[in-house]
């Protein structure tokens, strides 16, 4: 059960921190873990309680907590959340709440293709000259797909289209 709690701890510790290794958690992510896992219920355990417990268990000049400090914080919050239970039962209850949880990303926008957007972005449905702008895989050809390119090489600077002289005279 503790290993599952440690995995959840690591997932929340790394959430939103690109440079984080996931071994230490800051106050913001600790509050998020408590809220998302249901440890903070808003009545017996509030966000203020979570912040106070975080400040108690972290080192004096540190900004983050390790998993060992996290276990102490969870015990303290659990005593408040589950009154009348033994410390071991409290820890098991908290770990049960945390089991298999991931950081929730509510309010994050997701790309959707609806109606016209789907039709306009699918290059296989293009017609006319527009369909020549893309290869079979749907990747754009660039300027080669938009314009007819003449080869501007020849013996004289004004002569355009090398190799076309023989075709004209015959």
UniProtKB/Swiss-Prot annotation:
Subcellular location, record wording: Cytoplasm, Cytosol; Cell projection, Cilium, Flagellum
This protein's GO CC annotations: cytosol; microtubule; sperm flagellum
GO biological process: cell differentiation; microtubule bundle formation; microtubule polymerization; positive regulation of protein polymerization; regulation of flagellated sperm motility; spermatogenesis
Main location: cytoplasm
Chain intervals for the UniProt region annotation (Disordered): 127-147
Keywords assigned by UniProt, alphabetized: Cell projection, Cilium, Cytoplasm, Differentiation, Flagellum, Spermatogenesis
Source domain of life: Eukaryota
Biased composition (Basic and acidic residues): 129-139
Keyword Cytoplasm tagged: yes
Any one GO MF annotation of this record: tubulin binding
Family: Belongs to the TPPP family.
Protein purpose: Probable regulator of microtubule dynamics required for sperm motility. In contrast to other members of the family, has no microtubule bundling activity.
Name the UniProt record assigns to this protein: Tubulin polymerization-promoting protein family member 2
